[in-house]
Amino acid sequence: MALSALLELSEKEYDAFASVHPYANFLNSIYSGRKFALLGWDVHYVGICRDGEMAAATLLVSVKLHGSYRYFYAPRGFLLDYADHELLQAMCQGVKQFAKERSGLYLKIDPYVTYQEHDQDGKVVEDGFCNQKIVDDLQSCGFAHQGFTRGYDMANQCRWMSVLDLRNKDEETLFQRFDAQTRWAIRRAQRNQIKLTQAGPEKLPDFMRIIDHTAARRGFDTQDETYYRELFQAYGSQVKLILAEMDLSAYQRALRKEQMQKQTELSEIQGYSCKRARHQKMLREELDQLQQKLREVRQLELYAQEGKVLMGGGIFICYGQEMIYLAGGTYGRFLHFHPAYAMQWHMIRAAKHAGMRGCAPIISTASADRLRKIRMVMAYLPSSAVFMRMSSNCWETF
């Protein structure tokens, strides 16, 4: 089967191939190309055909270095079958030649290929897959692997992702596969009247206050507001800004309704048996807790705007067959209301309804200790897996 030379593609041609490819990712999408263009990079879409059908493609961006030289980058690597060595070799040679003709000095790729499967504690899964051969093949094509780096690095793409597979599972199956603590927290958030709303870029200042608070509390770096505004500008409707708010009036009504039910139940079991005495004690303790929550409402009113208290938020990106939880946080004083659980369960359901195959939060470090610290709801799921991706940089020099 004959392979073509490297072809320049239109944005439309590239998107038709990329959006349905197994290695599709928001970072190798046309929306990513638009974002690079906003930042002043040159943007190209190139590919190779086999017998008239597109077989490989990539987003290729470049920026000027010193003199006339340019740095080239293929975000999340090439979209092709990495097991097809002939195609991989042709793509590598074609892209290298393309860059060389345009004064390329360096070419970097960070393939969106799972290297090895790990469990939720960051340990290698026995009998799990390992794609070392792809690393070897890329090296044979002239790339130099920079190693499986560890730690948090804002300059490079994440290497660890916790992935929830949504295929062949309905909502009830997904929910029941959560651990007991997660199911309890989701139900508790619903009882706490946590409501989820999708907002536009006008709400980014509110989101930034949340994410900056969370970053300071948890000790991680974050992007500035300009970064997220550029996301909205480039990705449009693919970006979902979700805000988790408490409906204060609904919460207060729910507490008073539960209080009345407990009081009625208590009055109906007045008696002297040991069993009833224990039940009465439990009800009185629950009534005390409800009264404390009602007093807490007065404090919550200090944070309310138009009857709602903003507690948390997150930014998600939908592209291809996956939804990525890019960034999010919760005000520390509201953690016990579990807004993050409500938000992530809401978006898992949204991804399922949209027919996506997976949902994943980005985990930007390879430290097992750090993994345990930063993983959120989806990382607690027994049905999720942690993958180390082959995104440690591969460099080609010319």
Where are these regions (language model features)?
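A conserved beta-strand-loop-helix scaffold within acyl/acetyltransferase catalytic domains
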Residues: 4-68, 114-116, 121, 131, ...
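Acyl-donor binding region in acyl/amide transferases
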Residues: 68-154, 311-313, 317-387
